């Protein structure tokens, strides 16, 4: 499926974006190995998260999926209750699922194969294979990419590990393995990354120690069931935040969005660029802060993106670069080489698409330089990347003519009702097949 957009006359209204993808992954995994029943409200029913649910079900976890209410009811099997799956576990397009499951499965008393789609089979796994091997895991992989064959070892040993890059997925993988290891596992980060795993471990009553840059867990503990309500995903909200910011006449409110400080890079950077964003009704529930976000149109200026904001914005850069494309002046992003090993090479994909829409964009090995200008209509390729697809749908709100975005089926991995909500606030996005359009 493709997206076809036409320029918007302005966004308005109030919407609630779906539940946070990162928290959904972690919540169902921890609930599955907890003792007792956990109800998960606000679960993201996207393809990535449902791949995690399916994997846990194949290992014996009882998970009732109430899809139309975004609810899971999970009967935990306890720390030692998982069973060998009958076949390879298919993680679909989800790098988070395969990396979290690798940590969980490294310490089990059975062997497992983890695989995924063609995109996932190009994603780098050496970053988890090396530290898990130090803990005593044995993992076979050709070229350090999936499929991964994990030979479970119930006698893992805790390690002290310095992450070479700020990565919440790698950190979480090792913390999960640490739950099954003898002794203490401590992870030190070069910069803060999203901390949902740490917050959820606390929510499920598991003891951990944390300071500014390190997190430690000791093996042998238990997780206790605890109902959880998942806030809206700020990565999904970011598309509407940018769309309203760049489109004249816009004013929207996004309700009950997760505003975890380790995820606020996109708001921090947009405010540096001059955005009019107001965060209100701040509350904290289930260890996670939430708030309403009101956004009004504003004129933006280009900036040099501070390195400390890069890990806090890593998933939102595609749409942030759309904001940079219409800002006055130059925006420079560096220290973001991680963008090249996402679902696609996001640096190359964004530079390619922006150039096709008339924007001066230059690729760097670890980032991009964008000279703000005027978006023209045209046709771009999402390269089967959900965030690239939605980012260029946002570009279409302000472009001088229609924008066609190719290969958007993967939006279902993270935001199944994106088109519906986009049109609800006035973005004019249509899903089309063949050469149809508006």
From Swiss-Prot:
Quaternary data: Homodimer or homotetramer.
Keyword Amino-acid biosynthesis belongs to the record: yes
Gene: aroA
Keyword Repeat: no
Entry function: Catalyzes the transfer of the enolpyruvyl moiety of phosphoenolpyruvate (PEP) to the 5-hydroxyl of shikimate-3-phosphate (S3P) to produce enolpyruvyl shikimate-3-phosphate and inorganic phosphate.
Active-site residues per Swiss-Prot or TrEMBL entry: 315 (proton acceptor)
Region of interest (Phosphoenolpyruvate), ranges: 93-96
GO cellular component: cytoplasm
UniProt-listed Enzyme Commission number(s): 2.5.1.19
Similarity section: Belongs to the EPSP synthase family.
GO BP terms in the entry: amino acid biosynthetic process; aromatic amino acid family biosynthetic process; chorismate biosynthetic process
UniProt source species: Coxiella burnetii (strain RSA 493 / Nine Mile phase I)
Binding-site list for phosphoenolpyruvate: 21, 95-96, 123, 169, 346, 387
Catalytic reaction equation(s): 3-phosphoshikimate + phosphoenolpyruvate = 5-O-(1-carboxyvinyl)-3-phosphoshikimate + phosphate
Stated name of the protein: 3-phosphoshikimate 1-carboxyvinyltransferase
């Amino acid at each position: 499926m493709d997206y076809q957009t036409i320029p918007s006359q302005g966004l308005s209204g109030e919407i609630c974006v779906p539940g946070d993808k990162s928290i959904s992954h972690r919540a169902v995994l921890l609930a599955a190995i907890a003792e007792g029943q956990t109800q998960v409200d606000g679960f993201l029913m996207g393809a990535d998260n449902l791949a995690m649910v399916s994997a846990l079900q194949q290992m014996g976890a009882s998970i009732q999926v109430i899809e139309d209410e975004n609810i899971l009811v999970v009967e935990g099997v306890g720390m030692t209750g998982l069973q060998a799956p009958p076949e390879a576990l298919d993680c679909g397009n989800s790098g988070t699922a395969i990396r979290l499951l690798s940590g969980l499965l490294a310490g089990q008393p059975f062997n497992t194969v983890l695989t995924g789609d063609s995109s996932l089979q190009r994603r780098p796994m050496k970053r988890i294979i090396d530290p898990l091997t130090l803990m005593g895991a044995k993992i076979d992989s050709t070229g350090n990419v999936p499929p991964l064959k994990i030979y479970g070892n119930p006698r893992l040993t805790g390690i002290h590990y310095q992450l070479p890059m700020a990565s919440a997925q790698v950190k979480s993988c090792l913390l999960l393995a640490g739950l099954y290891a003898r002794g203490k596992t401590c992870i030190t980060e070069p910069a803060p990354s999203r901390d949902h795993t740490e917050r959820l471990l606390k929510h499920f009553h598991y003891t951990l120690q944390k300071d500014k840059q390190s997190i430690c867990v000791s093996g042998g503990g238990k997780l206790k069931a605890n109902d959880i309500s998942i806030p809206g995903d700020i990565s999904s909200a970011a598309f509407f935040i940018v769309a309203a910011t760049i489109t004249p006449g816009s004013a929207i409110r996004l309700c009950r969005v997760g505003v975890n400080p380790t995820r606020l890079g996109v708001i921090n950077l947009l405010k540096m660029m001059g955005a009019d964003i107001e965060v209100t009704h701040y509350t904290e529930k289930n260890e996670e802060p939430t708030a309403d976000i009101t956004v009004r149109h504003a004129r933006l200026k280009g900036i040099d993106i501070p390195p400390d904001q890069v890990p806090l914005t890593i998933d939102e850069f595609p749409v942030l670069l759309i904001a940079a494309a219409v800002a006055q002046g130059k925006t420079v992003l560096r220290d973001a080489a991680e963008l090249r090993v996402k679902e696609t090479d996001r640096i190359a994909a964004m530079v390619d698409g922006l150039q096709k829409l008339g924007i001066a964009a230059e690729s760097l090995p670890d980032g991009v330089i964008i000279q703000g200008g005027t978006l023209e209509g045209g046709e771009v390729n999402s390269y089967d990347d959900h965030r690239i697809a939605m980012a260029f749908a946002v570009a279409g709100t302000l472009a001088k003519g229609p924008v066609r975005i190719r290969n958007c089926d993967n939006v279902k991995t993270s935001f199944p009702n994106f088109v519906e909500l986009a049109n609800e606030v006035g973005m004019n996005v249509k899903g089309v097949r063949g050469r149809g359009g508006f």
